[in-house]
Each structure stands twice: as C-alpha cells, then as structure tokens.
C-alpha cells in the first residue's frame, strides 16, 4: 500500500474555525462553551495529524463569529489554539489566544454553598496563572479552584 491518504475537513464559507486544540479537548470545549447550543452546522475533527502537536482536534462553526473575548476563554483548555474568522472562504481575522482575566457565565461554582447556586446571577471567576498553574476564583464565595475542578463541576 504505497498510496498516501490525506484527511480532509470541508472548508466553510463563513464562520469560525478553532484550530490546534490539544487532542481530546475538542468535545470538552464543545460542551463547556455551549457550542452545541447553536443551530448552525458544526464540523468536528478529532485526533487529526499535526506537525506541532502530534495530533489535534479542530472545530468549525458555520455562520458564527467568535469575538476575541470568547476566543480567549478557550485558552483555559487550549492555550496554543487559534481562532480563525472566515468570510467568503478566506481567513479575515486570526485570534492568538490569551488567558482572560475573568470568565463570566461559562462554569458553575464547585462550592455547593456558593450563593450563585441560589440566586439568579451569572457565574463569575477571576483567572490567575501562577507558575504555570491556572486557578479560578469565584467572585461570590471567593474560593479558588483549579480549571479541572471547575470544568468537572459543570
């Protein structure tokens, strides 16, 4: 079998492409960031070959343009990812992700005694990175958690 096979993911006309997601994080990102709530077509590539990562995940959301703030929230789970905004099959904007200072309305607080569970407020976490470890501090109960604990509580 000397025939070389190439994996192809269909191009989109307009929308957002989240590329260079670490393999295994694509499904988590779809769920945590409510990308499955859209009625637009979503194309997901899992464990695709990548020169830089070995393997990667990829998400394409048609007719949806992620803002820089939305894109930066992805940096918690995919710090090396890029978000490309596509118009008429061309990349018009490329967001290099930066860890945001705050994340609002994405995760629930893991502290069951937090007032955010009983009051009609959006969750709100301050984000800090110390010596490579990312921690999220709840605005309401002021408890601090690792990103893994917060995403599991989701």
Curated annotation (Swiss-Prot):
The keyword Iron-sulfur does not apply. Pfam families: PyrI, PyrI_C. GO terms for biological process: 'de novo' pyrimidine nucleobase biosynthetic process; pyrimidine nucleotide biosynthetic process. It comes from Tolumonas auensis (strain DSM 9187 / NBRC 110442 / TA 4). Binds 1 zinc ion per subunit. GO terms for molecular function: metal ion binding. Zn(2+) binds at residues 109, 114, 138, 141. InterPro entries: Asp_carbamoyltransf_reg_N (IPR020545), Asp_carbamoylTrfase_reg (IPR002801), Asp_carbamoyltrfase_reg_C (IPR020542), Asp_carbatrfase_reg_C_sf (IPR036792), Asp_carbatrfase_reg_N_sf (IPR036793). Belongs to the PyrI family. The keyword Thylakoid does not apply. Involved in allosteric regulation of aspartate carbamoyltransferase. It comes from the Bacteria. Its cofactor is Zn(2+). One of its GO terms (cellular component) is aspartate carbamoyltransferase complex. The gene is pyrI. Keywords: Metal-binding, Pyrimidine biosynthesis, Zinc. This is Aspartate carbamoyltransferase regulatory chain. Contains catalytic and regulatory chains.
